[in-house]
Amino acid sequence: MLLTVYCVRRDLSEATFSLQVRPDFELHNFLVLCELESGIPAEETQIVYMERLLVNDHCSLGSYGLKDGDMVILLQKEAMRPRSPERAAGLCSMEPAGPALPGTSGSRPHQRAQSAQHSSRRGSGEKAGPGQGLDSPALVRSMLLSSPHDLSLLKERNPSLAEALLSGNLESFSQVLMEQQRERALREQERLRLFSADPFDLEAQAKIEEEIRQQNIEENMSIAMEEAPESFGQVAMLYINCRVNGHPLKAFVDSGAQMTIMNQVCAERCNIIRLVDRRWAGVAKGVGTQRILGRVHLAQIQIEGDFLQCSFSILEEQPMDMLLGLDMLRRHQCSIDLKRNVLVIGTTGTQTSFLPEGELPPCAKLVSGMGPEESSDKETANAIKHSVMDSGRKKH
């Protein structure tokens, strides 16, 4: 009889091949044939047929109900690693039920190994007590707090668990940890069910397709983080120093904006609100919408030593004081030179540097007030302090 084998390796790569065997062919011999085709050692393989794991190596394939034209699933067992502090590092990659976070895909095999071990223990009737080895939330918590590297990874990749960890409440941390482990085990069971489902079931195939698509997205993100990590950083916007009516301003240079705009408060501060022509009122549309109060047809803007003519559309509410749009940039033949980090006024040849992040207005700064790093560092220090105090009390 001809059997089709759908192979899923430990690294989630897939392969499909066919084998011609007799119904009285024993399972352990079938595993050897699969090893020749897939390259996976026979002792690391599991065969699933009709959502059932074939475990008796000395039974014939026919005794399991296999017949000509059937498909079986070949799964590679997870690597059994020694129980070590790496378990705590694996927790840093545990993501909740939502989309995967950057850098988590590389640790998925280890996570599945943990869930498989947990399931096998429950299936054999072994009870994992709250204080048993690294399954103890208290021990996991202390290990994470004692490793700044793992703690920083946890805050980046699993914020909810990190928040529970830094709260100093062991019960809250245990609850979040167990909930995430339970969700991960359910997802793993669903994955195995889909792989062993009827290959002609449209719903199952759609779910498998979605899982493959999500895996491709995670792999693409992992490659991007490794090869081009700078693409995940935030970029400071382009601002320059200028003056309007002698009032110093920080203007946002935006070549994607059609017109130059100024907010109402800034227009009042620069004493040009009296020149607003309200016949030009309207609505500015972009990412959102803003009400245009009117237009100042002619004003003077000073950039370095140059005094340039400019017109402004006055917006009722706008976080930035002023935005230099394409109308003004084209009129004065301005060019944005990112290599030298300057704005060049083409009509005069004057250059003005773009502002560094520290000089940007509050609305444009990437971090305002106490940065998240500083805040999280304080939380970490407090959590470690409480942990040390608790351990000291237990010793006494």
UniProtKB/Swiss-Prot annotation:
Enzyme Commission designation: 3.4.23.-
Gene Ontology biological process terms in this record: cellular response to hydroxyurea; proteasomal protein catabolic process; regulation of DNA stability; regulation of protein stability
GO molecular function: aspartic-type endopeptidase activity
Active site, renumbered: 254
Keywords, ordered alphabetically: Aspartyl protease, Hydrolase, Protease
SUPFAM superfamilies listed in its UniProt record: Acid proteases (SSF50630), Ubiquitin-like (SSF54236)
InterPro entries from the UniProt entry: DDI1_N, Peptidase_aspartic_DDI1-type, Peptidase_aspartic_dom_sf, Ubiquitin-like_dom, Ubiquitin-like_domsf
Ubiquitin-like domain sequence ranges: 1-81
Region of interest (Disordered), ranges: 84-137, 367-396
Segments of skewed composition (Polar residues): 104-118
Family: Belongs to the DDI1 family.
General function of this protein: Probable aspartic protease. Seems to act as a proteasomal shuttle which links the proteasome and replication fork proteins like RTF2. Required, with DDI2, for cellular survival following replication stress. Together or redudantly with DDI2, removes RTF2 from stalled forks to allow cell cycle progression after replication stress and maintains genome integrity.
Name listed for the protein in its UniProt record: Protein DDI1 homolog 1
Gene source species: Bos taurus
Underlying gene: DDI1
